[in-house]
Swiss-Prot record:
Keywords: Endoplasmic reticulum, Membrane, Transmembrane, Transmembrane helix. One of its GO terms (cellular component) is endoplasmic reticulum membrane. Disruption phenotype: Confers resistance to fluconazole and to osmotic stress. Its main location: endoplasmic reticulum. The chain crosses the membrane at residues 14-34. It is a single-pass membrane protein. It is found in: Endoplasmic reticulum membrane. This is Uncharacterized protein YGR016C-A.
Amino acid sequence: MAVYSYYPIDMVLLAHLIGIIYLIIILGTLVMLFS
């Protein structure tokens, strides 16, 4: 598992997941503010 975590693909997927979660949080707060 330790060797697999060093793969760059893992970092790319993690970055995409964080970005998607960040966008969902921003959109959610905007909907709460403007609705």
